Amino acid sequence: MRLVPALLLSTALITQSVQAADINHQGAQELEQKFNSYLPETLAKSGLIKVRPGTADYEITFDPTILLKDVDPKTFSISGLKPLLSMIRPMEDGLWHFSQSADLDVKGQFTAGTEKTDFTYKIDAMRTEGVVDPDLLYFKSADMSANGLSMTSTSPQQSVEARFGSMKSTMNSTRATPETIDIRGNTALNGFTETIIDPSKMKVDISAGTVTADVAFNGLAYRPLQDLVFFILDNVKKDKLLATEQVRLKSLVRANLPMFENLLESIEVANLKVATPTGTYGAETLRYTIDTNGLKDDAKVGFGVTIDKPSLPQGLVPDAFASALPETVTTRISLEKLNLASGITYLIDHANFDTDKPLTDEQSAEAGRIFMPGGAMTIRYDEVSARSAVYDFSLSGTTTVYPEDQGRQNTDITLYAKDFDKTVSYLQKNATTVPEFGQAAFMLLMVKGFAKQTPDGRQMWNITVDESKKVKINGQDLPFQP
C-alpha cells in the first residue's frame, strides 16, 4: 500500500478545477482515482468511493456497508445503511462546492462480552452545503442542518432513548500562516429529551431547551496532521508495524508537535431539567469549557463548569436554606507547567510497540517526571465562586502537589467575600431554625478577625499552606498550630 502526499491530490484537484468547466467521464475517473489513492489498497478496490459525472456536478457515492463486510455478524450487525450521495462542483478559484442531502434510519445489535445491545439511529433529514479547500482536504466553510434526530439503546443494564428536534451547525477555516489554519465551529441543537431506565425500572428523564457548542482551533498545523492520518489509514489493519514503519510513525508524531496553538471549547445547556423519583432538579444554564495551548512544554489544560440558577425539588431542603441556595456556581481550574512535548517525545523514543507493555516500570516513572517537572503538578484555581442573595464568595490561587510523594503539597489561595456582614446576619437570624447556622456565624466572625478589606469593600484572606502544613492567613500564623 502506498501513501500519496496531500500535495499531489490538491495539485491535481486545483489543476482539474481550472479545466473542469465541462463535467465529464475523464474528470470523474481521475477524481475517483485520487480519492481512492488515500485508502488502503483493499478498500480502494472495494468500491467504497465511486465518482460519476452529473449534469452540473460530480456525483460522489460513499457506501459504508463495504466497511462492514468483514465484521462478524455475531458481534455486530446493522440494517438500513445505504450509500451517501454527495455533489462536488469545481469553482474557478480552485475550490470546490460541496452539497449533500440525506436521511438515516438504521437499527442493529452488538455484543460486548456476554451482553447484547440493540440500537437504532434515525435522522429524518440532514443537509450539508459548503466549500472545500482541496489543499486542506477540509471545508473552508460549511453549513449543516438536520431534523428529527433520535437514538435508542437497549441492553440488560439499561435502556436509553434520546431525541433532538433539530440541529444547525456552521464552520469556517482560514489560513493563519502558510503552514497553519484557524478553525471555528458552532452547533446549536433544540428540543433535547432523554429517558434512561435501569434494571430496577428506575426512570430518569432529562430535557433541555437548547444545547450549543462552540469550538475554536487556532494555529493548527494541518500538513503534518494529514500525513499522520493517512499513515494510520494505510496501516490500520496491521497487528504490528515493521521497524521502518515504526520509525516513520515516530517521526510523524514528532512533526505534529505542538500541533496547535490554542483549543477553546464551550458547551452550554439551557433550561436543563432532570426528573428523578425524588423530584426534578434543574438549572437555567449549565456551561462547560475546556482550553489548552497545545502539545508543548510548559503547557496548560483548563476546565470549567458554571451553573446558573440551579433548582431542587420542592421540600428537599428546609425553607431556611432556600435563600442560601446559590444563584450561580463557577469552577474553573487549570493544570499548569506540563511538559507535554518532552513527555510525548520520550514516550515515542522509548516505547516498544511490539509488546503488550510498551514501557518498563522505570521508563513509565521517568515519563511521569518529564511530563511533570520535578514531580510537581500545579493546579491553578482560575475562578471558584458561589453567589446568592445572602453571600458572594470567590477564590483564586494555586496548589502544587507531588503525585509520587503523597502528602507533599503547598497552597497559596486568596478568598474574597462581598457583603460579609449580610451573610453573618442571615445566619444569626435563622440560627433558631437551623442550629448549625449559629455555629457557622460564630466561625465567620472569628475568621473576619484575620481579614483585610479591599478598596471595593470586600473582605480578603490570603491563605498559604507550606509543605510542613504550616498555615498563614494574610501573613499571620494561624493560632494553635503544632
Whereabouts are the PLM-identified features?
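Gram-negative bacterial Sec-dependent N-terminal signal peptides
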Residues: 1-20
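Glycine-rich, small/hydroxylated-residue low-complexity segments
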Residues: 21-482
